[in-house]
Regions:
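Conserved interdomain linker/interface between the two RecA-like ATPase lobes of SF2 helicase motors
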Residues: 127, 136-256
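Conserved segment of the helicase C-terminal RecA-like domain
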Residues: 134-136, 342, 346, 352-401
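Short regulatory helix/loop adjacent to the ATP-binding pocket of P-loop NTPases
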Residues: 97, 148-158, 340-345, 372, ...
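Conserved C-terminal RecA-like helicase domain
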Residues: 24-67, 227-228, 234-329, 357-362
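C-terminal accessory/interaction regions of large nucleic acid-associated machines
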Residues: 439-447, 490-760
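Conserved two-lobed SF2 helicase motor
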Residues: 74-94, 301-338
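C-terminal helicase module of SF1/SF2 nucleic-acid helicases/translocases
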Residues: 377-492
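Conserved P-loop/Walker A NTP-binding site and adjacent catalytic elements of P-loop NTPases
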Residues: 1-142, 149-157, 162-168, 241-244, ...
Length: 760
């Protein structure tokens, strides 16, 4: 008896053992990510390489909160599921039976539960799982979690901290230090590195660099030039990562490095044996950015920059080339340096400031953890770059002592604390009686966002009969019970503060939401989308508009009129979340529909940039790519999927054909269902996904049909079809910059799978 098609058919050469033993436990692990998008792809690759050898199937559902129905079929045939926080939240809202199948929830980069809107979502998702699925084990992983025992006590109060495991061992020794200049400027200066903390300097390396007056100023003076000079110094020891806090800094450091290289006798890093690999990389990047783009040229010298506005396929190429050794120095933001396992010998910290705020000690140490290739190096180097002697002292004092890493604090607890300060006019002391205070509605933007996210999450979890009750005390009691299970409730209790003020605050706001949405069916429809209240109301209005249009023009559902139907849906999609992102930087909302149509039609990034750069005020092609990434593939796909859900549940419109896959078309930039299927399985090159889909001989295949056909094709045949490297599906990350936090989940068999296996 054959098994159902595997979601990762490209690994067919790794023969899986037969799943014939009914006693063999079936699990599916879903991974919810908080680090940059590259990490989840790497996690899935490594999990698949190990677990598929023992018959466990690894799948991924990346992206934001868009609902792509066919992708949920992966859940029926998977053991380990890699998902984003947003995606897991959406799955639990729309597929409640999934919760009962969870067995293990593994949260990588677990410190991402810290104070932020994303941290709040992770906290409430884990709370929901703890309440509804007590059999599921939850494990948080982090290298920068100083209050791990506190988090462990929240996850399992009865364990009394025995469920906390701390491992100090590291496969390589990490040397951390600060680079600074010494000497009088008029005489020239020498740059040295002091390794160790302010109290305990391990050793001192003098004269790493020298600088002299050139005309009227010292060179190198700017941080970018100092970082470039240090990169050339350390590159002789192994790969270098220049960690920056903003995309502009990453680009500036790479340009400075290129300028410094051009002044040397050998303006190329690495050996001659890497030239062919770099030339091929340059050609691949040129396909996306053009032959004249600076990245196309930089990579031939063994250097590059990496940040979130670079097109996703180009980021994948850069990551793989860095891992393979073709790139020797990579200048990157935290999008790459947080959590990703990289072959880094030295991390140079270019700056510790972002938007006039100094980055946290936790962020520094998380980036520092990239240094020292496991089992390849005996030690790694992390060097902070100081502007002057005083800056060096400050950096050493703040960052080099790991005891300074900030504890992870709940967003819910932080919301309570800050609102209490607003009410009291001072910080509440531990043990202070706060039972009778009334928390005010927030005025600051971040607190308002937190409060709105919290009330929507609570509204999702509270039973309808409780939400609609006229008994305010009953609603407060229900809110209190939910909040007590959150990390915030745990940490508020540790301060010996009453949870009642927060319960009253949230109950009041949830009741107000319910009054704004008196129709339970409309309320449920909005909550399934994950939109804000206003966004949900906008989606209901848009769905009614589309439904009325279809009533007046039923012929729009005919396959021949698909472009008109597509534009009808896209034009109606003006929900709040989309309006905000689409009109950012004074861009016109009118650009969304035509650009989305061209994106789906297969226009290349270069073609879209050439046509829309004036309309989008996009000076560089990466700005156009960023617009597509944030507006089209995330927010528009989310908005359209929400409208389609409401069309189906409230208007009874059966979603078939291309209309059902429109969110996936927007997400992946392809125009057929089979091409969407291919992209969902990890073929992130749009042309490759389209080409492979065209080879499928099955007319109008379902997702199962397509994966079954692909499963029967040998890996060399798939590779030949794609005209690409031997691992065409290796980089499967579809994460966006909105994706934060990583989970691994173990799922028991779906009922139909259980029957199938029993029949075997």
């Amino acid at each position: 008896m054959g098994h159902p098609p595997r979601p990762r058919p490209h690994r067919r050469n790794r023969r899986q053992p037969p799943r014939s033993d009914p006693a063999l436990p079936r699990s599916a692990a879903g991974r919810l990510r908080g680090a940059p998008r590259a990490l989840a792809a790497q996690v899935e690759r490594h999990l698949a390489a190990s677990l598929e050898l023992v018959g466990l199937r690894v799948s991924s559902l990346f992206g934001g909160a868009e609902h792509v129905r066919y992708e949920n079929q992966l859940l029926d045939h998977t053991d380990v599921l890699v998902v984003t926080t947003e995606k897991l939240d959406l799955l639990l809202r729309n597929t409640p039976e999934l919760a009962g199948r969870l067995r293990l929830v593994l949260v990588d980069e677990g410190h991402s539960i810290d104070r932020s809107a994303r941290g709040l979502r992770l906290e409430t998702v884990l709370t929901r799982i703890r309440r509804t699925t007590p059999q599921a084990r939850i494990v948080l992983l982090s290298a920068v979690l100083p209050n791990g025992e506190d988090i462990a006590r929240w996850l399992e109060p009865t364990a009394d901290g025995t469920n906390h495991a701390k491992i100090d061992w590291s496969p390589s020794q990490l040397r951390t230090g600060v680079f600074s200049w010494q000497g009088q400027e008029k005489d020239g200066q020498t740059g040295s590195i002091h390794y160790g903390t302010a109290q305990d300097r391990d050793f001192f390396v003098p004269k790493v660099l020298t600088r002299r007056l050139t005309r009227t100023r010292l060179f190198p003076r700017d941080l970018k030039d100092v970082a470039a000079a240090l990169a050339l110094h350390f590159e002789r020891l192994g790969p270098v990562l220049i960690s920056t806090t903003q995309p502009a800094y990453a680009q500036a450091a790479a340009r400075a490095l290129q300028t410094a290289l051009d002044k040397t006798d050998t303006p190329v890093l690495g050996g001659r044996n890497q030239r062919d690999q770099r030339r091929a990389l340059s050609e691949r990047i040129a396909e996306h950015l053009g032959e004249e783009h600076e990245l196309t040229v930089m990579v031939t010298q063994g250097i590059a920059y990496h940040h979130g506005t670079i097109p996703q396929p180009v980021r994948h190429l850069l990551e793989r080339s860095y891992r393979d050794g073709a790139l020797r120095v990579l200048c990157a933001t935290s999008t790459l340096s947080q959590g990703m396992n990289l072959p880094v010998k030295t991390v140079l910290v270019h700056s510790t400031w972002r938007n006039q705020e100094q980055i946290g000690v936790r962020e520094f140490w998380n980036a520092a953890g990239r240094a020292g290739r496991a089992f390849q190096e005996t030690e790694g180097h992390v060097v902070l770059i100081a502007k002057d002697t005083q800056d060096a002292r400050n950096l050493r004092r703040r960052y080099l002592d790991k005891d300074n890493i900030e504890p992870v604090l709940s967003t819910i607890g932080a919301l309570y604390h800050r609102l209490a300060i607003t009410r009291l006019g001072t910080r509440p002391a531990p043990g202070q009686n706060l039972t009778d205070i009334d928390l005010p509605d927030p005025e600051l933007e971040d607190l308002t966002d937190w409060a709105q996210e919290l009330e929507l999450q609570l509204l999702t979890m509270l039973a309808e009969e409780v939400v609609d009750t006229p008994d305010q005390h009953r609603l407060e009691d229900a809110a209190h019970d939910l909040l007590a299970h959150t990390l915030g409730g745990h940490q508020i209790g540790a301060q010996e503060w009453s949870l009642k003020p927060l319960a009253r605050f949230t109950a009041r706001r949830v009741a107000a939401l319910a009054r704004q949405l008196p129709d339970p069916a409309a309320r449920a429809a909005i909550l399934r989308t994950g939109l804000s209240l206003q966004g949900g109301l906008d989606a209901i209005t848009a769905a009614e508009q589309v439904a009325n249009t279809l009533t007046e023009h039923p012929g729009l559902l005919d396959p021949a009129t698909w472009p008109a139907l597509r534009d009808t849906v896209l034009t109606a999609t003006t929900i709040q979340e989309l309006r905000r992102s689409a009109t950012d930087k004074n861009r016109p909302i009118g650009a969304v529909v035509p650009l989305a149509g061209d994106w789906i039609a297969g226009w290349t990034l270069q073609e879209i940039h050439h046509h829309y750069q004036l309309l989008l005020a996009a000076k560089d092609i990466t700005a156009t790519s960023d617009y597509i990434d944030k507006v089209i593939t995330h927010d528009l796909a989310w908005a359209v999927s929400s409208i389609l859900q409401i069309l189906e549940t409230r208007h009874g419109i059966n979603l078939e054909g291309p209309l059902a896959t429109l969110p996936a078309m927007l997400k992946y930039g392809v125009d057929t269902a089979p091409a969407c299927y291919a992209a969902s399985l990890g073929i992130h090159q749009r042309s490759a996904a389209t080409g492979l889909a065209a080879r499928c001989p099955i007319p109008e295949p379902s997702f199962s049909d397509f994966t079954g056909w692909l499963d029967d094709r040998p890996a060399p045949s798939v590779t030949a079809t794609l005209h690409t490297d031997p691992q065409p599906l290796a980089d499967t990350g579809q994460l966006t910059d909105h994706d934060q936090v990583e989970l691994a989940i173990t799922i028991s068999p779906a009922p139909e799978d259980r029957r199938r296996r029993t029949s075997r």
